[in-house]
């Protein structure tokens, strides 16, 4: 692959860029990539072929043009430009992007925590209401056949009021989002992580699940529902709800029983 760069753009001293991948069938993908990590080290941007599964699949059948659209001296500026471009072309029939931005991932782009966030983001693809209902129906049917009442199962499925996140910091500077990944790195059991001499901090945080999200006059049951309607990433909706500069974005949390 070979990147095309306009003569007016200078890579030197830039840390990130936005790009477009164009295919012969007119389809295209807009993305963001770093020239350098937060530690100032060069990345593999010259060999980078996108994290999009759709792009990777199309590359098996087509040759693509890789175009650097703009260069930036900060990750945040590049992400904002990426979001602006995707919004501009989101209704274009040839665009391959399925969501607008992954805004919160710019904080620690090379940490283990960031990698885990990306992994979780791909695992938690937004499902349609029809798909969710089918999953619920199958669960209810399964437990019904195992001597559990439908009311009990429905209550069990919808009973989650909070989710737990873990942050484990090591002396080496590495951070992990689970005891399993930390144990693998430290070559010990999960039970031994808490008392391991290389562990300097363990934080366990309970994040309440929204009771509702209100944006302008519209009320949604979750960040995901709001994101689907506004064509934003759920994490971006959450960030806006917590930002004092956006008073029209409101979130109300359920009370967590202790």
Curated annotation (Swiss-Prot):
Residues 14-96 form the GIY-YIG domain. Keywords: Endonuclease, Hydrolase, Intron homing, Nuclease. Transmembrane segments: none annotated. Its EC number is 3.1.-.-. GO terms for molecular function: DNA binding; endonuclease activity. It comes from the Viruses. GO terms for biological process: intron homing. This endonuclease is specific to the nrdD gene splice junction and is involved in intron homing. This is Intron-associated endonuclease 2.
């Amino acid at each position: 692959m070979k990147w095309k760069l306009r003569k007016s753009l200078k890579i030197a001293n830039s840390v990130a860029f936005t790009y477009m991948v164009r295919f012969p069938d007119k389809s295209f993908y807009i993305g963001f990539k770093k020239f350098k990590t937060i530690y100032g080290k060069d990345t593999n941007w010259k060999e980078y072929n996108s994290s999009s599964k759709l792009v990777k699949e199309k590359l098996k059948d087509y040759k693509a043009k890789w175009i650097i659209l703009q260069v930036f001296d900060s990750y945040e500026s590049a992400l904002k430009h990426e979001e602006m471009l995707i919004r501009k072309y989101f209704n274009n029939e040839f665009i391959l992007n399925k969501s607008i931005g992954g805004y919160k991932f710019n904080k620690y782009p090379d940490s283990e925590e960031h990698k885990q966030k990306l992994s979780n983001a791909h695992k938690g693809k937004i499902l349609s209401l029809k798909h969710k209902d089918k999953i619920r129906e199958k669960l209810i049917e399964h437990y019904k056949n195992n001597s559990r009442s439908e009311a009990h199962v429905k209550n069990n499925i919808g009973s989650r009021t909070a989710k737990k996140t873990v942050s484990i910091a090591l002396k080496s500077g590495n951070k992990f989002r689970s005891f399993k990944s930390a144990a693998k790195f430290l070559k010990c059991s999960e039970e031994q992580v808490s008392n391991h001499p290389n562990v300097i901090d363990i934080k366990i945080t309970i994040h309440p699940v929204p009771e509702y999200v209100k944006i302008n006059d519209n009320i949604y049951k979750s960040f995901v529902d709001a994101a689907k309607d506004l064509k934003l990433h759920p994490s971006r909706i959450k960030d806006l709800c917590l930002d004092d500069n956006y008073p029209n974005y409101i979130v109300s949390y359920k009370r967590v029983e202790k």
